[in-house]
């Protein structure tokens, strides 16, 4: 049984060696900055697109969230069903949302499927 009338001894935190991976930068031909890092040995990737299009930039209340919600509802070249079927075919996950400061699109998939999925994301 623990004696809760006396405080436990204070111990030093466990020592560990923590190093962040190097962040690489690149500018695309259209001037958009690209940042990436190699974070491990798994063949999975997370790609984030960040846009200055959050709630603070919306002309009317609700526009940012409504726009984010509509992005997966089809494009001029693909229906919502086609987009979802392609993501499902490759086991990919796509999250689209808006916050106060920005809107974002996040893709999770296997590295080998990126070339097949990117055209769909570009059409969105």
Q: What is the predicted role of each segment?
A:
Residues 2-4, 88-124:
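Acidic/histidine-enriched segments that form metal/cofactor-coordinating
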Residues 1-86, 106-109, 119:
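His/Glu-rich zincin catalytic helix
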């Amino acid at each position: 049984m623990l004696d809760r009338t006396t405080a436990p001894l204070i111990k030093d935190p466990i020592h560990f060696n923590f190093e962040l991976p190097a962040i690489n930068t690149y500018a695309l031909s259209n001037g958009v900055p690209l940042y990436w890092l190699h974070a491990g040995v798994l063949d999975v990737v997370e790609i984030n697109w960040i846009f200055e299009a959050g709630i603070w930039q919306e002309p009317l209340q609700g526009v940012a969230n409504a726009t984010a919600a509509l992005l997966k509802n089809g494009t001029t070249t693909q229906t919502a069903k086609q987009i979802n079927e392609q993501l499902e075919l490759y086991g990919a996950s796509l999250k689209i949302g808006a916050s106060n400061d920005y809107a974002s699109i996040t893709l999770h998939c296997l590295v080998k499927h990126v070339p097949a999925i990117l055209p769909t994301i570009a059409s969105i």
